[in-house]
Amino acid sequence: MIGKTYTTMLGGRELSIETGRLAKLVSGSVTLRYGDTMLLVTAQAREEKSPLDFLPLTVEFEERHYAVGKIPGSFHRREGRPGEKAILSARITDRQLRPLFPKGYRHETQVIITVLSADQQNAPDVLGPIGASAALSISDIPWGGPTACVRVGQVDGQFIVNPTADQLTRSRMDLVVAGTRDAVMMVEAGAQTVSEEDLVSAIEFAHAEMQGVIDLIERMRAEVGQEKFNFLAEGDLTQDLVPELAEKARAGGIRDALLTTKKKERSARTKAVRDAIIAGYVPDPNAEGAAARIASLKDAYAKVEKQELRRLILEEDLRADGRNGRAVRPIWIEARPLPRAHGSAIFTRGETQVLGVATLGTERDEILVDDLTTEDNDKFMLHYNFPPYSTGEVKRMGGQSRREIGHGHLAKRAIRAVLPSFEEFPYVIRLVGEVLESNGSSSMATVCAGVLALMDAGVPIKAPVAGVAMGLVMEGDKYRVLTDILGLEDALGDMDFKVCGTAEGVTALQMDIKVGGITPQVMREALAQAREGRLHILGKMAEVLSSPRPELSPTAPRIISIKINPELIGKVIGPGGKQVRELEAMGAQVTIEEDGTIRVFSADGAAAEAVRARIAGLTKEAKVGEEYEGTVVKTAPFGAFVNLYAGQDGMLHISQISEERLSAVEDALNVGDKLRVKIAGIDDRGKIDLIRPELEGKIAPREPRAPRGGGDRGPRPPRRD
């Protein structure tokens, strides 16, 4: 069956979107191709309205191993749960789609992105959002797109649209931007400390480049798009009471209740105002129909609270905890609260508190990253934990949520930019952010706590990093940017803009817009205000730890790096691994690389040093003429074996022991005796002949050892018939 294909150029390569050939029973279906990367993207919504009071949208990103010609490595040889990369890719798509569904839309909607082919150069994570935008645009699902998404890199000072995997390794930034025709909706960035102005320029560049994709999707919608189905919005008559409820709330003290500093106390006071107002409308909560009426009134009252909070911010520059728009909450920091951890710190900002813990390990602890676009070992891990007690709630605890994975990834990108290279600091690093209290910006507090824990552990980071979450309240042309937002401001505001960086520039950024998008001018103002807040936080961190501790934590393991001749690796390994097992039995882990780099890892510094000395002995290349203070380790009728250094013995012939003729070696030497010896010769098998330097010239030198086999034995006698 022949479908209809639409094409445009993006980043110098053709992007094609086809519809009408695959998955035709679904509401919206497209097949997208870019290079040899292909995706099938579908969109479907239920006909009946969901009883949920939020948008029931799910986005699934399905990686298929056949896309790169692989068979899954699982026991059943089939794909399992989505990996971290797939979850992050799904979140990128979700964040650009969600704000554009109409208000009151409550139909369960599912977008599924299936990677059919991956060329490992053109990443599917930024193609999925384009496919989702196209599938929704041509479907019968109400949605306010289209949107487009591109990645921007910067190589040699030039911006590149959708850089290949090879180009991305040389890029100063990895920026993903999604937007509509007129505005930016979502930004995700990791960078090697770039300026705020460079970021804004890159975002503007991305927005201009995505216009061709938006043109293409609009053309698709005009030619093959379906009529959108009608849905029933909230339509509750109680919503008409919002102005009346607002008057009653103001009379009941809503302003003072909202401006209460502490979260629990504020919740209690606003609840008391709400309940008093509702009681005036429903005096008997047990009456028939009262429960539904109360629920509807609560929903309407929530709008009143939102309106009042936004009014206070815009008109009076007052926030829920009494701060103005630019203020950062009070900060309290403690370094090394955990006595046995390699590095630890507590970072508290207002009612958000995170315990950061750093653990140092060896290459054996690195994690294998094996997805459709990457096969590598990651030597830096950051795990973000968000238990229910952090918000004073009771919830089921299970595996990591998508939110935890996303927040951890952002913090990881922020910190990775300042880590030393593995050659400079040969440790695998695991950071854990334990969120103990959460009232906004817990991921940014994780960045601060994590960096402090690294410095406490003695990790030589390039510079401290801090993070701050920015917010926005916008009504028409009037807006106010907020620094260090509360959870309440995140829920009721129009933007969540997280910015991380050093004093010199930005290392990571994440922006989600809940309105139709923001202009570059608002973005510049938000970045400038974020820098102001970030520098304030860095100053508070410096009061406790301004730089990494000069020495590793006493509880941290020690790693000693040794470089040997690669031809001597066999000596360290030994026959069947015998030698390396003996080394590890001394209390250390030993890793050996093909280039001759050996790393000795031990929690016991003395054990690590002993193993290093043993390896140095095993790999030392003895030379004729060198003298050693040796120890007799064995005697034989023909001479004594003398240990020169770890792993290397030489033989002192009986004729070279004394000026006098000896009938037995034991007449002059016994096991354990120490003596000065000199290397007289080394045969082709590495066997060492020794002499005593003080007797040199006084006794006749011994003839060199004859080679064992392989010499010239003369001609073979004639064969007898």
UniProtKB/Swiss-Prot annotation:
Catalytic activity, EC: 2.7.7.8
CDD domains, alphabetized: KH-I_PNPase, RNase_PH_PNPase_1, RNase_PH_PNPase_2, S1_PNPase
Keyword Ion transport recorded: no
Sequence segments annotated as region (Disordered): 693-721
Source organism superkingdom: Bacteria
Function statement: Involved in mRNA degradation. Catalyzes the phosphorolysis of single-stranded polyribonucleotides processively in the 3'- to 5'-direction.
Protein's name in the database: Polyribonucleotide nucleotidyltransferase
Lineage: Bacteria, Thermotogati, Deinococcota, Deinococci, Deinococcales
Gene name of the record: pnp
